[in-house]
UniProtKB/Swiss-Prot annotation:
The chain crosses the membrane at residues 15-35, 63-83, 95-115, 136-156, 192-212, 242-262, 271-291. Keywords: G-protein coupled receptor, Glycoprotein, Membrane, Receptor, Sensory transduction, Taste, Transducer, Transmembrane, Transmembrane helix. Pfam families: TAS2R. It is a multi-pass membrane protein. GO terms for cellular component: membrane. Glycans are attached at N170. This is Taste receptor type 2 member 109. The keyword Transmembrane helix applies. The gene is Tas2r109. Residues 1-14, 84-94, 157-191, 263-270 are extracellular. Belongs to the G-protein coupled receptor T2R family.
């Protein structure tokens, strides 16, 4: 019975790892395509709009994050003792935190940009921010850098505490599995705390966009008869983008919370593989949501698909 259970776990883990590899490749293609299209447009026009800058920076940060995951998983599987040394735990935890933090905050800046550009409020504070979208985005990124510095500082303090606790028992440069797991849980806890800030900010923009759409719809019912106007359509498109971001981001956060609360399951390879698949869905699939929403990216993707479809005829 134990042999059958182990065999089932092994098969499940292998299937999940294959799915993970496919997810990483899909994410690299989507984010690489986004960055390439905007960079080519920048070279052609000699300028880049704010939203394109955010999209390019977001895609670039996710490419780095996905490559880090793609390279890191095989190394951790083939050389498990290497990744549990003091230096490697600090290096990989810090690098993952930086890559993920930057990726999440650029996506949050995109939500803030959509809100300020599309929402319609008459109060003076909103109009003041609306006229200074670039400054608002710059300040948001500056705040994210301060939080990143605090996150890394707290992260290294927790890792050092974990290392010192282990050294009191057995002086060695290698973590045994229990203390390696304990260190990972502390890293996750710290990361979840700092991720709550962009979650609250994105959720606030989402709720304010809904309120703006509701007030606009109410005004239209009083003065205009007919279907949607351009502003209403823009509201719906912005809401779709923010909903997709919040949905994928919520799944990502729930995965981290699950790993934090049920940390005993992190000893099970299938559970680790499952969490990695869920974590990777956010940076991989969100890029395709942005491609479908952006007219330039959508047209470029259709051109590439058309070229790929016609290519076999040219080869013949």
């Amino acid at each position: 019975m134990e042999h059958l259970l182990k065999r089932t776990f092994d098969i499940t883990e292998n299937i999940l790892l294959i799915i993970l590899f496919i997810e990483l490749i899909i994410g690299l293609i989507g984010n690489g395509f986004t960055a390439l299209v905007h960079c080519m447009d920048w070279v052609k026009r000699k300028k880049m709009s704010l939203v394109n800058k955010i999209l390019t920076a977001l895609a670039t940060s996710r490419i780095f994050l996905l490559w880090f995951m793609l390279v890191g998983f095989p190394i951790s599987s083939l050389y498990p003792y290497l990744v549990t040394t003091r230096l490697m735990i600090q290096f990989t935890s810090t690098l993952w935190t930086i890559a993920n933090h930057i990726s999440v905050w650029f996506a949050t800046c995109l939500s803030v940009f959509y809100f300020l550009k599309i929402a319609n409020f008459s109060n003076s504070p909103f109009l003041y921010l609306k006229r200074r979208v670039e400054k608002v985005v710059s300040v948001t990124l500056l705040v994210s850098l301060v939080l990143l510095f605090l996150n890394i500082l707290l992260l290294n303090l927790e890792i050092n505490m974990c290392i010192n606790e282990y050294h009191q028992i057995n002086i060695s440069y290698i973590f045994i599995s229990y203390y390696h797991l304990s260190c990972q849980i502390q890293v996750l806890g710290s990361h979840i705390i700092f991720l709550s800030v962009p979650v609250v900010l994105s959720l606030s923009t989402f709720l304010l966009l809904i309120f703006s759409l509701w007030t606009l719809h109410k005004r239209m019912q009083q003065h205009v008869q007919g279907g949607r106007d351009a502003r209403t359509t823009a509201h719906f498109k912005a809401l779709q983008a923010v909903i997709a971001f919040l949905l994928l981001y919520s799944i990502f956060i729930l995965s981290l919370l699950l790993q934090f609360w049920i940390h005993g399951l992190r000893k099970k390879p299938p559970f680790i593989a499952f969490c990695q698949v869920v974590d990777t869905a956010f940076p991989s699939f969100h890029s395709y949501v942005l491609i479908l929403r952006d007219r330039k990216l959508r047209h470029a993707s259709l051109s590439v698909l058309s070229w790929l479809k016609c290519r076999p005829n040219y080869v013949k």
